[in-house]
Amino acid sequence: MTKQRIAVFSGPNATIANSPTLVTSNKGRRFDERRLDGRFDHLVAQELYEPVTVRIKRFSAHPLEADAAGVYHEPDRAYDEVELRPEDGPYPLPYVSRRADGSPDGVPFEDEDLEDRSIGYGGRQFYYPDAARLFAEIDRTITGRDEDGSGSALDRRADFDFIRVLPSGGYASRGEVSGRDYFPYKPRAIAHRPRYRDLATATNVVREAMRSGRYAGGIWLEASPTLEETLYWCNLVLDIDISLVGCASQRPHGQLANDGDRNIVDAIDFILSGERLGVVALQDERIFAAREFKKADDRPGNYKVTGGHGGILGSVGPPVTVWYRPAYKHTHTSEVNLRRLPERVAFLDRADDRSPTTIRIKDGERLRPEVIPRVHMVKYGAYMDEDVLDDPDGEVDIMARIARGLEQQSRAIEGAPPFHGFVFEGLSPYAYGSGSQREALKIAAFSGMPVVRVGRADPGGMVPKRGWPHAVTGSNLDANKARMLLMASMLKLGRWPKAKDPRHPTPEECDALYAAVAAYQALFDTH
């Protein structure tokens, strides 16, 4: 039977595609050097240089093997002999490499090297440049066997293409640069996270692969805290009808009790089941809707759903079982997917404009990196008011962002971001804040910058549609998800119409703004 093929995308800061530090084993240390504590030397998956014949002591795989010696062929033989070959794949072996320091023998590699600026924080990487080695080690049972005691848990299920999108590890020797070509979070002193423009790169690469007809589905690997935003963005903008599954891990591959390897196996089973639920996350055997998926803590089992009304769609079982299906628009039904976005978005830049302003957001079917909107989040907390004057100028962060946005819009022809907006996280469920915040965000709205209001932290219900007519109510989305939907909405609808004096809009300018708010609200009510 021909196996189906799955695309495996490498995303940024991905613990699931990381490994523990390669520390020199005791077998690679001189007797006058620091010894690692413990009765056993640690082992690291490595490839053989040449074939070697080894003798394996009989009945040493389990304490009760000898107790059942009668069921073994030739039970009196002391050892089994086997030839190990390089093409077998990696074997767990002592790690004996040493760091060059100018001395004749070098020095052991240590975990502390990652904190030492004088040696370039160790000069090595432990993220995988793509998932190929990760998959090979899972198949080789380096970190555990399948339920039936065998290996090749991935290879038996499907074939794979490994696609570097915004990978966590990179080839510095080939000119790749951290923060531009790849995105690690360790060593922490030189960690980098993706830039806003990189979201367009991810969108284009994943979309082209997933629409190529070559794949049964795709797996996206990313950092556990930010996976939720990428998946919801993909759920909104990818016009696909096959499954994209996000996977993360709380512990690196190869570390004790790693959970990511199992999540990958389960993601493959979900894809091969043929169920199509849009973009989902698969963590700890549960299938999460991208819209409600959220990380709560860095321990296995601590992903949850937001919004207060569901979000776990099913379980991988076995068998894969789907209990609920998303009711909101996603992927091929989304109104903001890439196919439905115009090549040039048209909007009235000012309420009294006679003709629309247009901005090119796509080159053919590819999203332009420079048009990714800049959306900033503002939060309300009790006792934040400075006075009773509701003075917007007291909200210096909001006012500075408005000024920065207007300045960048004036330079959009030079490649500066043309779209800006705000997400306001207020009280639950009303999404209210201080009077000064309200007035500052009103100025933002009449400066052409869409504003969305959401409830605090992990909302348990929808924001009531009352209070601030100059802002969209963000349904039961949390602030991070509302930000992604606002970004996608701006690519479809453009900026809000500016007032000549944003502090004192005319009735006509208010009507123009409220019409724009309504168009945005329709998207937030259905996605």
Regions found by a protein language model. Name each.
Residues 2-527:
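Active-site histidine-anchored catalytic micro-motif
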